[in-house]
């Protein structure tokens, strides 16, 4: 995307459209399922989905005409809001909506309590006659549903009722299998600028010409929805209390490009200051910071949203695998509902986490984090950056405020004494938008109930029984099974605690992840990148070719040693330039000094060849044929992994350093494309909150730099802002996106003018429609676009100077005897029946009895000698793994086992002794639940006289076959990178850390550091209260919640590397031929691989393809196929094929009695280095290798890793060593990948 042309991404066209369509019941139900609806409102907030709410080829970015001049029009770039508003004839959609009680009254009460501004329709203006508008486009109003989509730049005009529909340009488009009429909407500035009266050119919510008054689209219900869903929410993010002022400012900002002027500061109120004990200087610093970041975020929201974006893959509704795979409409609704249930985990995190982005909008001055100012009364920028933080703002929602003149204004609301989290808090953070509150309540009715044990489930049961009296505050007894009061009773144990004191915490955000990542155990260390890759990488260009820093984020220093918020890295750790790479100008990583991925790929190749994992999916394919086979396979695997770890230690000692290993950084990217979450309006709402949080956090750096040098000397904060804001704006625009956290890019146009045929707006204002050629100018030749934010984690804890290691990372060796609880426990569970047929005991109990020497004699265990060897092997492997285990995470598949073993051995061999931090992805799953905990399955408001009657009714539901309700839970992914490879929606806590550059530079950098969820009700897998007092894994492990979107909403991209069935067979055949399994003829294994997926004998051309063109080998295989045909063999199992084709070899082996020819002398190395053992190459077979602090010999590897004093002869680590240090004649040489 680095070579995109602005004119191609954003064609000339209207930035708002009306759609007139006739919706059938199926489409209405789909819209009700995906949209935000409430019974009290006729407006439905629907997702912006191509093929459902807009046409399939809908362009999300346009250059829209805004102003006229003689002979042409001036266009501005804008992108469409990621939602659509249905507002006429929506009864059919709302009818499918669940009733949640009187949500409208709840929102009104919240406005009164928190003194929020309410929407007031224009008293002297008549709403647009929608029936006449429908008739003008040939539609019948009683059968036509109307909805609008609008660009970010024009949404204020839509709110003001000033957009002009041009019915003469109506066109027919297709929406979800039906036809719709699309009518463009134009801004009033195109017509106002032609009026003779100069005052008519004034852009305002109230000033309108007679033409706009008569023709403008004014729907009060739409304006009200925008007022609460968009603007009240934005005001909360910006700590601004007057939405109408913000709307007016946004209106003029888009038309007049007034981003560099002060717009909000004169009207701003400073909330949350009264509960802080601040000196006058601290208060001045906090007020100025508050005003600056608010103004910058408001200005740059216009800059970033009025830009050019590409449609996200997840907004193509007609191509969703979920849609294309549905068999009928009911199956589609079931799949869409299950998708929403998956999303309930993310919604729960946003509601139940006290550090959610919904609440993190208060700016505070943390005195404990600040250093005392110098005697001169000044403070440094670093001091302010540590002191001024964003925190939970619920506790300060009812405080007195300061105005622009720093005078105290009394709070005008009606605060309650009980400040426990309740429905009004939810209404507050939803901007008192009924549709949004109702959307949250739907999810709260379907998340799991966490009982405390004190009252169990009796609280919910008693509430439902009490509903029979009809005294419910939410619904009056009409819908108590689904109302918001019942929802809050269900989740009362999971609700967040309103904090009494502010504190610095990470912020929980929900966005879509990007594909590229560095999240394996050691992240960026030892990873080499393809700088010329099309999509870039985490090295220099970043995801999608973003310039400006590698995974280290632009270079810098580790500013202190101690843990930050209990994280694995030092405070500021992870933000500096990454170790393990050579940093170029601007922090760009050019390449790692060592290649860890080479070693890992060798291990993975070995696993493929040994048939331990699937060559394509990576899933386990190992099948234990017996205890001896199990021991042989994993003894060889462990030896190979350990040898690779030793070899890598030698390579690192030659080419790298311990500091580089300790500086390893894990990193992943979060997508800021607004259309990545356009499939759900609730997520779109959270997206805007997240973007404002990101911009304001980054803006703090610019704000503090000017505040330190320019103290407040006037009575008005806005006056100081007027004096300095233009410089502040310029500084932020040039530095905000090149400091390691926020990534943007400039999309440029090669020309500033063009010619096309457009509507003659002068004639249209006079009542005549005409299309004429005219010049089209572009107001800006380049626009900045949001790309992503990068989040990091330092896995290896680095203690500060003079500090002992943290107790959270100290490793205490506790022997673990039971193999079922050890590193290979997942295989013992999986193959228990095969290893011990007819055992009669489950796996865990069996091994408990074995380890306790209490296994009954009547339990069949097979040959005693074989069993003893098997148990000794497992005990030894378990003890060895635990001795070197620095991850403290039990493997659950072969891939995670070999990766963990390799890194554990490498780190221990290299001298690391403490636990390291780790990243974990928790992906959502659906499980069945108890009917009694999900009252929505009752179908009607409860009318029970006692708990016993309710229990009997629930039992009747089960007897009647009512399906058990489903709820989302999570499971840990074996490999966290799969979260990003499956394009997941993720909820992750992020803290934005700031630190100074190297060499006493005044540059301040920032990085996103993964943090923690605050509260016990977020997700039970995150809770730590059930752990023992000495278990500190929760301080070392960082989690993100994920829902996979690949193959659900995103069609998996195949690109050019499609693997057909023949390719898969060829891969398996070549792996079988490469395998060094002495127990079976490799050709017989190849025959088995071919016949395992075919029912007939293959043709010779096919066999020639499977063996990569080797004619002699193909002829040999064809002889075996001919033998099978002659004998009429139909059983193609491996055992039968060996019996038929490998019988002679088996007889020879049995007759030899295990004796073999001694041919070792033929393979002994020769030459000068053979006798001396230089590079580990002169060892005889079976000879032991001595290892010490400076020499690690690797048996069977030439050049595999001795640390040589004079290594100049071969930089790879030994005479004759390979370039990777991996050896040329090792145990299993690396071969060219055939995948």
Swiss-Prot record:
Chain segments carrying region Required for nuclear localization: 1232-1235
Compartment(s): Host nucleus
Principal location: host cell
Chain location of the short sequence motif Required for filament formation per the record: 846-847
UniProt keyword annotations, A-Z: DNA replication, DNA-binding, Host nucleus
GO annotations of cellular component type: host cell nucleus
Region of interest (Disordered), ranges: 536-584, 1214-1235
Entry GO MF terms: single-stranded DNA binding
GO BP annotation list: bidirectional double-stranded viral DNA replication; DNA replication
Compositional bias annotation for Gly residues: 545-584, 1214-1226
Similarity field: Belongs to the herpesviridae major DNA-binding protein family.
Main function: Plays several crucial roles in viral infection. Participates in the opening of the viral DNA origin to initiate replication by interacting with the origin-binding protein. May disrupt loops, hairpins and other secondary structures present on ssDNA to reduce and eliminate pausing of viral DNA polymerase at specific sites during elongation. Promotes viral DNA recombination by performing strand-transfer, characterized by the ability to transfer a DNA strand from a linear duplex to a complementary single-stranded DNA circle. Can also catalyze the renaturation of complementary single strands.
Assembly with partners or alone: Homooligomers. Forms double-helical filaments necessary for the formation of replication compartments within the host nucleus. Interacts with the origin-binding protein. Interacts with the helicase primase complex; this interaction stimulates primer synthesis activity of the helicase-primase complex. Interacts with the DNA polymerase. Interacts with the alkaline exonuclease; this interaction increases its nuclease processivity.
Name the record gives this protein: Major DNA-binding protein
Protein species of origin: Human cytomegalovirus (strain AD169)
Lineage: Viruses, Duplodnaviria, Heunggongvirae, Peploviricota, Herviviricetes
Gene designation: DBP
């Amino acid at each position: 995307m680095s070579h995109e042309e602005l004119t191609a991404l954003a064609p000339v066209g209207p930035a708002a459209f009306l759609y007139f369509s006739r919706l059938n019941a199926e489409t209405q139900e789909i819209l009700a399922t995906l949209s935000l609806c409430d019974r009290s409102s006729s407006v439905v907030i629907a997702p912006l989905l191509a093929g459902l709410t807009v046409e399939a080829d809908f362009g999300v970015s346009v250059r829209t005409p805004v102003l006229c001049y003689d002979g042409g029009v001036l266009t501005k770039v804008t992108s469409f809001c990621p939602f659509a508003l249905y507002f006429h004839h929506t009864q059919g959609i709302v009818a499918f909506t669940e009733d949640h009680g009187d949500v409208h009254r709840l929102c009104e009460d919240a406005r009164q309590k928190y003194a929020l501004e309410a929407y007031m329709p224009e008293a002297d203006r008549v709403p647009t006659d929608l029936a006449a508008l429908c008739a003008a486009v040939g539609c019948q109003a009683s059968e036509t549903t109307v909805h609008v989509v609008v660009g970010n730049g024009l949404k204020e005009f839509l709110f003001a009722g000033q957009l002009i529909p041009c019915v003469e340009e109506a066109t027919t488009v297709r929406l979800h299998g039906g036809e719709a009429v699309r009518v463009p909407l134009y801004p009033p500035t195109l017509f106002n600028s032609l009026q003779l009266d100069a005052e008519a050119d004034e852009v305002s919510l109230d000033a309108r010409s007679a033409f706009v008054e008569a023709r403008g689209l004014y729907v009060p219900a739409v304006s009200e929805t925008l007022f609460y869903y968009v603007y009240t929410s934005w005001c909360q993010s910006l700590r601004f209390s007057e939405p109408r002022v913000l709307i007016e400012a946004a209106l003029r900002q888009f038309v007049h490009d007034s981003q560099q002027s002060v717009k909000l500061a004169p009207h701003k109120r400073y909330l949350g200051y009264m509960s802080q004990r601040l000196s006058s200087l601290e208060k001045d610093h906090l007020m100025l910071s508050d005003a600056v970041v608010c103004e910058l975020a408001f200005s740059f929201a216009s800059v970033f949203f009025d830009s050019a974006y590409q449609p996200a893959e997840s907004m193509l509704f007609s191509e969703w695998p979920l849609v294309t795979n549905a068999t009928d409409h009911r199956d589609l609704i079931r799949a869409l509902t299950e998708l929403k249930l998956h999303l309930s985990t993310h919604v729960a995190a946003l509601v139940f986490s006290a550090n959610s982005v919904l609440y993190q909008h208060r700016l505070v001055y943390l005195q404990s984090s600040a250093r005392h100012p110098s005697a001169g009364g000044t403070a440094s920028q670093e001091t302010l950056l540590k002191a001024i933080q964003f925190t939970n703002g619920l506790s300060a929602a009812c405080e007195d405020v300061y105005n622009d003149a720093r005078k105290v204004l009394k709070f005008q609301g009606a605060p309650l004494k009980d400040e426990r989290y309740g429905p009004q808090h939810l209404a507050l953070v939803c901007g008192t938008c009924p549709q949004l509150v109702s959307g949250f309540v739907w999810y709260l009715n379907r998340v799991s109930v966490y009982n405390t044990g004190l009252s169990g489930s009796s609280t919910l049961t008693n509430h439902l029984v009490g509903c029979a009296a009809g005294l419910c505050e939410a619904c009056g007894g009409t819908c108590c099974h689904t109302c918001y009061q019942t929802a809050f009773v269900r989740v009362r144990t999971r609700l967040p605690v309103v904090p009494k004191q502010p504190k610095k915490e990470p912020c929980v955000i929900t966005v879509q992840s990007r594909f590229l990542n560095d999240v394996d155990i050691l992240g960026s260390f030892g990873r080499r990148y393809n700088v010329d890759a099309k999509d870039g990488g985490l090295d220099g260009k970043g995801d999608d070719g973003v310039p400006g820093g590698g995974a280290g984020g632009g270079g810098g220093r580790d500013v202190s040693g101690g843990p930050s918020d209990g994280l694995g890295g030092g405070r500021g750790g992870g933000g500096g330039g990454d170790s393990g790479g050579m940093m170029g100008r601007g922090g760009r990583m050019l390449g790692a000094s060592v290649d860890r991925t080479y070693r890992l790929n060798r291990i993975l190749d070995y696993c493929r060849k040994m048939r331990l994992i699937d060559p394509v999916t990576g899933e386990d394919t190992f099948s234990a044929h017996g205890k001896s086979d199990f021991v042989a396979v994993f003894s060889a695997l462990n030896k190979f992994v350990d040898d690779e770890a030793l070899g890598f230690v030698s390579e690192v000692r030659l080419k790298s350093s311990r500091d580089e290993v300790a500086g390893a950084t894990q990193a992943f990217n979060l997508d800021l494309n607004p259309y990545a979450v356009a499939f759900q309006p609730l997520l779109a709402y959270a997206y805007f909150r997240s973007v404002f949080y990101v911009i304001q956090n980054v803006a703090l750096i610019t704000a503090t730099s000017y505040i330190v040098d320019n103290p407040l000397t006037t009575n008005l904060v806005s006056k100081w802002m007027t004096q300095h804001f233009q410089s502040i704006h310029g500084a932020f625009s040039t530095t905000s996106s090149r400091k390691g956290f926020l990534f943007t890019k400039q999309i440029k146009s090669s020309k500033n003018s063009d010619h096309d045929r457009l509507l003659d707006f002068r004639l249209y204002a006079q009542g005549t429609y005409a299309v004429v050629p005219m010049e089209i100018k572009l107001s800006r030749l380049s626009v900045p676009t949001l790309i992503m934010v990068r989040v990091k984690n330092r896995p290896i804890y680095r203690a500060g100077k003079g500090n002992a290691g943290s107790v959270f990372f100290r490793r205490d060796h506790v022997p673990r005897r039971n193999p079922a609880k050890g590193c290979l426990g997942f295989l013992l569970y999986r193959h228990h029946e095969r290893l011990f047929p007819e055992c009669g005991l489950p796996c865990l109990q069996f091994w408990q009895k074995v380890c306790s020497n209490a296994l009954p004699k009547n339990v069949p265990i097979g040959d005693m000698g074989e069993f003893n060897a098997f148990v000794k092997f497992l005990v030894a492997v378990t003890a060895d793994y635990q001795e070197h285990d620095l991850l403290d995470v039990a493997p659950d598949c072969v891939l995670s086992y070999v990766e963990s073993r390799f890194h554990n051995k490498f780190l221990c061999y290299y001298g690391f002794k403490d636990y390291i931090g780790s990243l974990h992805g928790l992906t959502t799953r659906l499980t069945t639940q108890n009917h009694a905990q999900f009252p929505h399955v009752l179908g009607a408001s409860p009318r029970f006289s006692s708990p016993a009657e309710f229990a009997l009714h629930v039992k009747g539901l089960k007897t009647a076959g009512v399906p058990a309700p489903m709820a989302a839970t999570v499971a840990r992914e074996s490999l966290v990178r799969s979260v990003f490879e499956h394009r997941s929606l993720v909820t992750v806590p992020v803290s934005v850390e700031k630190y100074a550059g190297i060499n006493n530079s005044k540059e301040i950098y920032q990085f996103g550091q993964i943090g923690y969820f605050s509260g016990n009700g977020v997700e039970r897998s995150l809770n730590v209260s059930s752990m023992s007092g000495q278990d500190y894994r929760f301080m070392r492990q960082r989690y993100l919640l994920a829902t996979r979107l690949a193959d659900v909403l995103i069609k998996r991209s195949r690109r050019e590397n499609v693997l057909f069935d023949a390719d898969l067979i060829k891969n398996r055949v070549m792996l079988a031929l490469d395998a060094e399994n002495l127990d079976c003829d490799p050709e017989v294994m190849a025959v088995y691989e071919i016949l395992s997926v075919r029912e007939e004998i293959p043709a010779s051309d096919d066999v020639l393809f499977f063996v990569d063109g080797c004619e002699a080998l193909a002829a040999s295989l064809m002889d075996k196929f001919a033998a099978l045909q002659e004998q009429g063999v139909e059983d193609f199992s491996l055992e039968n094929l060996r019996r038929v084709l490998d019988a002679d070899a088996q007889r020879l082996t049995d007759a030899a009695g295990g004796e073999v020819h001694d041919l070792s002398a033929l393979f002994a190395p020769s030459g000068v280095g053979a006798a001396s053992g230089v590079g580990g190459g002169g060892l005889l077979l079976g000879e032991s290798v001595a290892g010490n602090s400076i020499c690690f010999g690797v048996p069977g590897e030439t050049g595999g890793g001795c640390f040589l004093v004079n290594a100049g002869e071969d930089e790879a680590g030994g005479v004759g060593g390979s370039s990777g240090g991996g050896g040329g004649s090792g145990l299993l040489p690396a071969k060219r990948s055939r995948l």
